[in-house]
């Protein structure tokens, strides 16, 4: 039985996908793309609110991929769930644990904007590493520099070109269409999208006096009579966004479309968008949105499943993500 232990082996580590409560539907879509089944994982809460996790089968020597968006009203529970599952995998001798986090919670707290503030995005990175996470896969971080908070590999994917393909299927006059950056910080990304679509770019200039509040001071670029595509990384309360939309309309913009990777949609955000003078608001399924694609709703959703699945495949098979033929998937 043991005579050949000294000989080289061609043992292939098995890939196993698991879903957290923050990405159940997206996890199913990713598994379907990969022709895999989601594996059994017990995730419960005790009566006092503490989280319990247990893998239903052995993960010894396996490549474990745990899919979890850290967003929504239970954002803290979802973060804790991720940490506990990572610890369970480490203690069960998994070969590696990759946290697939389509939406990275606390990403906006990436610097000290005022004195005596924390840098919570860095804290979350520290917690994930301490829990035993070996690799991160995420989509459209609020700030790309967050990758530098980690001492483990981070694959930063983008949904930008998924939006590009979505709008290319629209019957737009591209000579009369403009991509609008919601602020100066997104100007580079807006330029990438405008180049991909073959149209012009404009930039909104804002003043931000407090959290979740900003005032549009003006627009750099010509938007009068043009179809406008506003692109951002996330929509939270949508108050600032609706203010930008109103400003664009006052300046003579034509049809307005909104696109954002992460539809956080806090408070009255969905109601604000449904009543705003826009044609559509397109988000991805990085964060679940029950009203998206329902009849009569302006909220539309496209999936990042294939982009994420392709990344998982290339990580597992040790192929390059950026050179795999997946197109423009890595930011």
Q: What function would you assign to each model-found segment?
A:
Residues 1-331:
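PRPP-associated nucleotide enzymes
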């Amino acid at each position: 039985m043991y005579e050949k232990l000294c000989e080289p082996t061609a043992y292939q580590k098995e890939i196993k996908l698991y879903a957290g409560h923050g990405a159940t539907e997206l996890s199913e879509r990713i598994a379907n793309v990969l022709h895999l089944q989601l594996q059994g994982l017990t995730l419960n809460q005790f009566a006092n609110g503490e989280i319990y996790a247990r893998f239903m089968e052995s993960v010894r020597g396996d490549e474990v991929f745990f899919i979890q968006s850290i967003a929504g009203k239970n954002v803290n529970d979802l973060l804790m769930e991720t940490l506990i599952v990572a610890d369970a995998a480490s203690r069960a001798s998994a070969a590696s644990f990759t946290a697939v986090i389509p939406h990275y919670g606390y990403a906006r707290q990436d610097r000290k904007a005022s004195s005596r503030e924390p840098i919570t995005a860095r804290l979350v990175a520290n917690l994930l590493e301490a829990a035993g996470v070996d690799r991160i896969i995420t989509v459209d971080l609020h700030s790309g520099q967050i990758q530098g908070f980690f001492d483990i590999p981070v694959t930063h994917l983008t949904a930008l070109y998924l939006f590009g393909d979505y709008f290319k299927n629209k019957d737009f006059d591209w000579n009369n269409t403009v991509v609008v950056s919601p602020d100066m910080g997104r100007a580079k990304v807006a330029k990438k999208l405008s180049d991909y679509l073959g149209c012009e770019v404009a930039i909104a200039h804002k003043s931000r006096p407090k959290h979740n509040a900003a005032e549009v001071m003006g627009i750099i670029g010509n938007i009068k009579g043009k179809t406008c595509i506003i692109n951002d990384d996330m929509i939270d309360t949508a108050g600032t966004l609706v203010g930008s939309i109103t400003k664009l309309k006052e300046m003579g913009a034509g049809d307005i479309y909104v696109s954002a990777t992460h539809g956080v949609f806090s408070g009255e955000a969905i109601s604000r968008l449904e009543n705003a003078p826009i044609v559509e608001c397109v988000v991805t399924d990085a964060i679940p949105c029950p009203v998206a694609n329902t009849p009569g709703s302006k909220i539309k959703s496209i999936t990042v499943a294939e982009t994420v699945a392709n990344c998982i495949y290339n990580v597992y098979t040790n192929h390059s993500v950026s050179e795999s033929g997946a197109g423009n998937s890595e930011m």
